[in-house]
């Protein structure tokens, strides 16, 4: 059954996106649907990272009095996207939550992936939220150059038509996972974790397209569904702006993009040449921080007023900076 949220007017609708990174590695994105009074009526989180006792994702959810996450996506089991996911499940997921996981990530020894310490605990937490009537665990894949509608809901103003909101998965690709499973069975070759990455597109009213690209790389990008990228409003640049993910530039608009990246310091990411290419076509380009460890985190906040002023306000915290 389609979920519906009543709002007084489209002009009161706000979309807040928080892109969170840390001084050495780590990525999490919190997306809040709210009214003009900052009342949150839908929450989406992609990935998590924590550094010691610091979990900025949890802090943000607490700040906005979020009682439960509607949709949690664990894009792939790399450490810099995974630490603290189990904390979010334990504190914010209930019998209404959906948890997206790449198809084939089931915590078994035969999954053709080398799990990090703690990954299987995350998977156990996810399965623990399954019940007879509500399957929280949603394994995600789609065919090459295809897309999968993950969820949808409508905003219902008093005096206007409903606004349709859709969330699509554009990866990982089922063909590659099947091939990787065969190679593991026959040759004991592990799959590269980034090739499991879930890439999401949030479509608001078929007018605004927000892309959460996790760590997809060129092998996936070369076979990804292109249409939504051609109309992109916002893109979290894949794989910390590496050259190995730069083919996405061929699919994106030539100007007026809003783009951002997290970092992975030990790998020398973001790549300066890749950032220069994004800079040319972006009205806004931000990073969660490439400077020295003045602060141990960086947060980029985008406050979208899509139907009132048709504007975006940007606020930077910690190490976050303009490129």
Identify what each model region corresponds to.
Residues 37-44, 51-102, 226-242, 253-257:
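Active-site metal-binding motif and surrounding structural segment of the metallo-beta-lactamase
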Residues 2-9, 95-164, 223-224, 255-323:
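Binuclear metal-ion centers of metallo-dependent hydrolases, dominated by the metallo-beta-lactamase
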Residues 1-68, 138-234, 304-323:
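Core dinuclear metal-dependent hydrolase active-site scaffold
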Residues 249-251:
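Adenylate-forming
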């Amino acid at each position: 059954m389609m979920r519906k949220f009543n709002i007084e007017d489209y002009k009161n609708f706000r979309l807040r996106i928080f892109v969170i990174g840390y001084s050495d590695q780590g990525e999490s994105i919190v997306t809040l649907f709210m009214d003009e009074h900052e009342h949150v009526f839908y929450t989406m989180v992609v990935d998590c990272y924590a550094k010691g006792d610091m979990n900025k994702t949890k802090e943000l959810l607490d700040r906005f009095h979020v009682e439960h996450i509607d949709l949690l996506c664990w894009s792939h089991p790399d450490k810099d996207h995974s630490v603290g996911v189990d904390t979010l499940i334990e504190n914010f997921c209930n019998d209404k939550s959906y948890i997206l996981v790449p198809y084939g990530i089931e915590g078994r020894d035969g999954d053709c992936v080398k799990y990090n310490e703690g990954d299987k605990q995350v998977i156990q937490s996810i399965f623990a939220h399954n019940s007879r009537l509500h399957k929280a665990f949603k394994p995600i894949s789609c065919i090459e150059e295809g897309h999968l509608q993950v969820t949808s809901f409508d905003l219902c103003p008093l005096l206007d038509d409903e606004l349709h909101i859709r969330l699509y998965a554009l990866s990982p690709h089922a063909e590659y996972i099947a091939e990787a499973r065969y190679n593991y069975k026959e040759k004991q070759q592990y799959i590269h974790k980034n090739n499991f990455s879930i890439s999401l597109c949030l479509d608001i009213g078929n007018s605004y397209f927000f892309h959460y690209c996790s760590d997809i790389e060129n092998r996936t990008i070369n076979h990804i569904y292109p249409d939504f990228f051609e109309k992109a409003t916002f893109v979290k640049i894949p794989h910390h702006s590496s050259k190995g993910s730069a083919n996405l530039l061929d699919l994106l608009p030539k100007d007026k993009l809003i783009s951002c990246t997290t970092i992975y310091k030990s790998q020398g990411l973001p790549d300066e040449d890749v950032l220069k290419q994004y800079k040319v076509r972006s009205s806004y380009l931000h990073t969660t921080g490439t400077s020295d460890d003045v602060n141990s985190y960086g947060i980029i906040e985008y406050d979208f007023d899509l139907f009132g002023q048709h504007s975006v306000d940007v606020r930077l915290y910690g190490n976050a900076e303009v490129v």
